[in-house]
Regions:
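Glycine-rich phosphate/diphosphate-binding loop of Rossmann-like nucleotide-binding domains
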Residues: 16-29, 112-185
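Rossmann-like adenosine-cofactor binding region
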Residues: 161-238
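Phosphate/diphosphate ligand-binding glycine-rich loop within oxidoreductases
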Residues: 6-111, 231
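Adenosine-phosphate binding glycine-rich loop
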Residues: 220-221, 226-274
Length: 274
């Protein structure tokens, strides 16, 4: 349902990486709040002509938008943008660093099905080394009192990650045995240095989540995945489409979370000014 909360406001989605779920949900979120939403891709911006990111956002700010949503392949890019514009900036994913709104929608999805988050055990499986989703969720989940375990072959585990307070495991079956929630991450081939994995087939032989694995976990263990999904590599088709899977619920909740972010950053200021 469309509401007039942000009528007259302008949101710019500035995405320097491909995106289906995140970009579209930010757009839908803005439009459902009646904001004017402008989408700009890196390929359609003047950065392809040599313009810097800073010059790009300063020029956009000169057009008086109310908020910038930034996704960039470089870690720290949205934080850098905040130093040069006097507008709210939402990090929609920056390199291998963070993806804050994804962790919020993941927590909302889990809470809808588990209630209180405190004490829940979460197993994060997959390409931990290159995953901004893993980093944001480790921080968010621990803040909410959840216990986090990361499961992957050694080359995909960041050195020193134990210092974040997580348990490290290299065996999928053992690692998920006591999990309340299993978060599967895709292998991010676009971010990997060559040679970390011998082959995707070998990875899937040991770390693809299947119904056989789920036969050894609790009946109410939940499966989530931030997408996009590489079917048959990190998760089997039957698990993805099975009753435990909340993958599409996550997508639905992404719109609600991003509407809430826009409202908190823009809507409340309108209410206070009135």
């Amino acid at each position: 349902k469309k509401v007039p909360t942000l009528r007259g406001r302008t949101i710019i989605n500035l995405f320097f990486e491909p995106s289906t779920r995140t970009r579209t949900s930010f757009e839908i979120a803005g439009k459902r709040l009646s904001a004017d939403v402008i989408n700009i891709s890196g390929a359609a911006s003047s950065t392809v002509k040599g313009e810097s990111l800073i010059d790009t956002v300063r020029n956009l700010e000169a057009m008086n938008p109310d908020i910038l949503v930034v996704r960039h392949n470089c870690s720290g890019a949205p934080a850098l943008v905040t130093q040069f514009v006097n507008r709210p900036v939402i990090n929609a994913g920056d390199g291998t660093h963070e993806h804050p709104s994804q962790s919020l929608l993941d927590l909302l999805t889990i809470r809808e099905h588990k209630g209180d988050l405190k004490g829940l055990k979460v197993a994060i499986v997959g390409d931990i080394a290159h995953s901004r989703v893993a980093r944001s969720n480790i921080h968010a989940m621990q803040t909410m009192g959840m216990t986090v375990k990361v499961i992957a072959p050694p080359p995909l585990i960041p050195i020193g990650i134990e210092e974040l307070g997580v348990e490290v495991c290299h065996d999928l079956a053992k690692g998920i045995k006591d999990a309340d929630v299993i978060m599967i991450l895709r292998i991010q081939l676009e971010r990997q240095n060559q040679g970390l994995l011998s082959s995707l087939r070998e990875y899937s032989n040991y770390f693809c989540l299947t119904e056989k694995h789920l036969s050894n976990v609790s009946d109410d263990t939940l499966i989530i995945h931030p997408g996009p999904v590489n079917r048959g590599i990190e998760i089997s088709l039957d698990v993805m489409e099975g009753p435990r899977s909340l993958i599409l619920n996550q997508v639905t909740n992404g719109v609600a979370i991003r509407m809430a972010l826009f409202y908190l950053l823009l809507g409340e200021s309108d209410a206070n000014s009135n």
